[in-house]
Amino acid sequence: MAIEKCIQTVRKAMPDLSDEQAEELLAEVVDIVDTIKSNNAEQKVTDLQGAVDEAIKSRVKDSVREAAILKRNAAINYRVRLAFITKLRETPIKEVPRMLQAILAGEMGKSQYKQSIESTSRGLLSMAKAVFMQTMEKNGVPRNVGIGFLQNKKNGRYLVQEVDNPGSSRNATAKAVAEAMEAANEMLRKQANKYGADIGRILGRIVKQSHDKTKVARASAEQWSRDILPLLDKTKTFGRPMSEAAQLKFLANVHQNIVFGKRIDTVIDIDTTNLKAKDLSAPPGFTGPANMGKKLSRSRSLHFKQDGKSAWEYNQAYGNDHIGSAFTNQLLSMSDSVGAMMHLGPNPKHMLDEFYAKARDRAINEKNLDVAGQLDQAYKAKTDLLFDEVTGQGNVLPGLGQSGYYLARGSNLAKNLSSAALLGGTTIASIGDIGTAAIRSNEIGVPFFEANLSVLRGLIPEAVGGRGGRRTGEAREIADSLGVGMDALMASVQSRFLGNDALDGQGSSAVSWVMRVTGMNWMNDSLKTAVGMTLSNYIAKQSGKKFSQLETSIRTEMEAYGITPEDFKLMNGVVREVDGKKYHDISAIDDLDAQIRINGFFTGFADSAILTPGARSNVFSRGLDRGTVKSEFFNLFMHLKSFSVTYGMEILSRGFSKANEGHRTGMLVKIVLTSMVYGYLASTIKDLAKGKEPMDVSKNYGKVMFRSIMQGGGAGFYGDIIVGLLGDKPRRGEGAAEIAGGHVIGNLFRLGKVPQMLFSEDYDRAASTTYRVAKSMLPGANIFYARWALDYLLFWNMQEYINPGWARKHERRVRKETGQ
């Protein structure tokens, strides 16, 4: 009866509440009172009513704020829905399936659908990296020094000290890098809040607290809780005095949240210590008072002591022990999440499902059975895969205790070791990128020879009197504003050849090391800088024109990325002359959304010229969720093929596209001739690096041309394999499975034959095969400038020791098959 009277009192005070909401509110008030009473002795609360009033006042303030946020998010959702409905009506019915998936990832090749979550997140990420670089330089630390400092795992301790007590590390570089990290995060935080998040600023925050799910899971809840408890600031973490038993119970809940918490479409609260995630999947609406009450009982936050060592010690034991890696991953995940919110509102997956339903309804209402059939469950499944890819969830590995945990990680380790062994010659193979860059630049209007020269000049560094490389001074400022030439900060360089696969952990550091010592980081950044600045200069030279007066080729390219006449006016207003040439300083544009859109255009174009796999090619190359035998076998088969897939989808497709009607033959001729020229150059340098004589063109014209096209075109690393499969005689005992299956699968087949060799007492061949496999998985074994010396001083001697007479047989075989 007393409860009913209380409910009636609540209803009288707030007549708009239902009985259920009144009961929830009453339960919350009772919980507040009980909590204060239970801690009365410790808190020395003499005025219980005053304490209750204060707690309720704080609760009401939180509720009002949440209601305001929900109202704002509802308005954002309305705007997003309206924009989609308008676009759906304007899009021809046959184009609807393409248009819908292009919201997630723009189409490759010649297409009008390029603006997407992916292009937006790339633009955001490039802007965040530019903020980081420029803030470091303003603080007196050159970017190459700062990046090197960040990439050194041991320097994480100094960064933690700077966060806890600025200046305490007594390391000027650490101080500058920490401030730059905070500035980059702050830019992304503001953009996230603009589009539906509610992330508070914390001064000094450089990276969210990380938790290695596997490490935490391996420790019992009790062990983890007792290990972390001495490291915590108990006042900030628990909010009120608690007994040790209560603290351990609280931490046990946190342990469960970390180990079993389901990864969903989220924007992570990037408070350094906050575990809370804002659910982007739930539909908008007021959550009611009980939801906030439940939030009070959740595992909310862990605050470490600001002593310069507690957070560091926790990361070494249970978190990401590489602060630099955690920071770059955070920039990437935040850019992905904000990009998703900008296109789909605060609840991206919910909104995407709604868009899919509306598109299918239109097809059904118009009785278009063909389009309705295309929008089937298989289409929906692929769309969901694309969504996972562009929101950073596409390569999530199974957790400890889940099926496929060891299989997926073993697969990653094998691929990374293989990559670290093979990619030592990437810098030479990437000479072919000059050709693709020239083709793309020429396609939008840059004269063909000028396009080739501008990219070639980009490889002549300023240090030797050129105007290329990553650039410095004003030229570098322009490149930063365009969002190009900064991939080396992250794993973006190796992702050109690995997709987004196997980039973190399981030997990935070996791949990063190879990219660095071979100069591939520098070459990639230099080429993208050259492409971006060539494009900017070409457009800036036409700044006196109206958008409608631009050549059709460049205008349609810009329109595909969502660039409007208003955006073009903004670009014309920030034209700046550097070294006698006109460029755009995009960072001078006040409209941040326009700046992101324009950055997405420049970075997208650079990624299509210096081929970088995107979400579509990654989904094609990966296909399935990780951890199953089928998915891992497919992953191994597609290992190092993502570059070739991207070439086919981005470059080769332009020679067959209906959108290129009337220009397809000319495009194919340019692709073939350019591939042949730069492929011949790459294969010749590769032969010299191996200690071989260049192939005699007059005696092997057909083979040289075929080999050159394979090397300069999209075959990339697999140019050697295709040449081996079609142009050369395979090794004794090897078939198509070993050659075409890829490096890792080929090695598995080779090792699988060793027991048979031993059984047949062919010991020399068994030893030689085992040695060959081991060498092919040795990181750094193929570094181009050391290859000749390593072969003659080490590898050939080892092979000769295992198989006497091998060197002479090998030399005869190579000369017979290749004439070299």
Language model features with spans:
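N-terminal leader/propeptide segments of preproteins
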Residues: S243-L344, T556-E559, E566-D567
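Small-residue (glycine/alanine-rich) low-complexity segments and short Gly/Pro motifs
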Residues: F656-K775
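Short linear, low-complexity motifs centered on an aromatic residue
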Residues: Y195-S210, G445-L459, R654-G662, S760-T769
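Hydrophobic, often aromatic-rich secondary-structure segments at membrane interfaces
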Residues: K305-I428, G432-M705, I709
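Hydrophobic alpha-helical segments
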Residues: M757-Q820
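Short linear interaction motifs
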Residues: P166-S169, A184, I199, I268-L275, ...
